[in-house]
A protein has these predicted regions:
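Beta-rich nucleic-acid/ligand-interaction surfaces
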Residues: 229-233, 255
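Short His-Asn-centered micro-motif
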Residues: 144, 224-225, 248, 343
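Short, solvent-exposed helix-loop connector elements
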Residues: 46-53, 348-355, 372-380
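Acidic/histidine-rich, metal-coordinating catalytic segments
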Residues: 145, 219-230
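Structural preference for beta-strand elements that scaffold enzyme active sites
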Residues: 139-141, 220-222, 244-246
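Short, surface-exposed basic-aromatic patches at helix termini and helix-loop junctions that form
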Residues: 235-244
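Dynamic "connector" segments at or just before major functional cores
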Residues: 1-196, 202-215, 241, 263
């Protein structure tokens, strides 16, 4: 059996010259202009002259790239959406995708550093014109962490196998937040895939702290990081700029021995606001105990690099019910320990709770990886 009639021809075209598909770009571009982004690019970005004009008009090209990314473009070809319908009547100076691709390919490491300078100054202006970090004059937090972005192809510059055993590039992010604000990315670095997490971390921390200060973080400023960034250079970079630190410690023999000296009566029980999944014990946990003791870190280094501060320990019961026969209990409780090194002036409970909130940077990384920006991270 077959149809006795030809199928009707159906076609769709979305090229109405009066159609504006991305009207929300208008306030975004106006805010960028009010904060001086085009002027900052024109002042700080200098590309070499070429016969094909690749490096000409960097401000117009950068604004086109920013607008395209805000509109959801995840490739160079997608930048053509800025020239769709009536977009050309709403915005002027929009460049073709091929022009933008040639512009980006002309960048060297030095030109990327120029863009970093633009981003720092723009964030300062954005904080001046908007309530970007409310409460920053009282307390603010800088969180740093790195991640691996998978890449494909054998010729990708800088790609390699890092700590995750995945071939890709290593991205380092610095995030600023306050108790009243959402996290804001203040600094970024794109590094070779095999890069150690702590490579160049001290300079990166210093840059992020300076950016946070320029955005109004004039009060208590605490750097939070995981154990990959536990080092004398990172902590001393914080202290040199008047910032506090709260960094997860590696559980080496010295740290374990120090925790063992804590008196049993010094442990204070706490209850987590929400249950947490314990990967090691493969179970949910909802309570723990905390204590603190003074600790001198980096004793193998010169005296001026050694740091004495608070060691905050958290211990969690090992709940291994699956290994205990039915109807029987354990002879005694066993614990897993987690340690943080901090000079925070807050009380023990508050300092420990604030340290756990370092997980906010993990959410920022997840948002970046699961948004349109992930493809730009891979294409960089």
């Amino acid at each position: 059996m077959q149809s006795s009639h030809a199928a009707a021809a159906v076609s769709s075209a979305f090229d109405d010259p009066n159609l504006i598909a991305y009207g929300g770009l208008e306030p975004v571009v106006r805010l960028a202009e009010r904060c001086g982004l085009p002027a900052l690019v024109g002042e700080h970005v200098r590309l070499p002259a070429s016969n094909d004009g690749t490096g000409a008009f960097p401000a117009a090209k950068l604004m086109s790239l920013v607008g395209g990314m805000a509109a959801g473009a995840d490739s160079i070809d997608d930048m053509d959406r800025l020239r769709h319908g009536a977009m050309g009547r709403l915005f002027s100076g929009v460049r073709a995708p091929s022009t933008l691709g040639s512009f980006l390919r002309s960048f060297t490491h030095g030109h990327v550093k120029q863009l970093h300078a633009v981003a720092r100054r723009f964030l300062h202006e954005l904080a001046r014109h908007t309530p970007l970090l409310p409460g920053a004059d009282q307390a603010a937090y800088v969180d740093i962490d790195d991640t691996i972005r998978r890449t494909h192809g054998y010729a990708k510059q800088g790609a390699g196998y890092g700590y995750s055993k995945v071939k890709g590039l290593n991205a380092l992010l610095g995030v600023v937040s306050t108790p009243l604000s959402a996290p804001v990315i203040a600094a970024t670095r794109l590094r070779k895939g095999p890069s150690n997490s702590a490579r160049g971390a001290a300079a990166f921390v210093a840059e992020t702290i300076r950016t946070a200060r320029s955005c109004g973080a004039s009060g208590l400023l605490v750097l939070r990081a995981d154990s990959a960034f536990y080092g004398a250079d990172v902590i001393n970079a914080c202290r040199a700029l008047g910032a506090r630190f709260s960094i997860t410690m590696r559980m080496n023999a010295s740290v374990k021995a120090t925790i063992a000296r804590i008196d049993e009566d010094a442990w204070t029980p706490i209850k987590y606001p929400q249950a947490v999944w314990d990967e090691e014990g493969q179970c949910w946990i909802s309570d723990a105990e905390i204590a603190e003791i003074l600790y001198t870190a980096f004793t193998s280094k010169p005296k001026k690099q050694q740091v004495t501060a608070r060691l905050i320990a958290r211990r969690v019961k090992r709940l291994s019910a699956g290994t205990v026969p039915a109807g029987q209990g354990t002879l005694f409780d066993t614990w897993r320990y987690h340690a943080a090194f901090t000079d925070s002036p807050l009380a023990l409970r508050d300092a420990e709770r604030d340290h756990r909130r370092h997980a906010v940077v993990e959410q920022v990384i997840a948002d970046v990886k699961n948004s349109g920006y992930r493809d730009w991270l891979q294409a960089a």
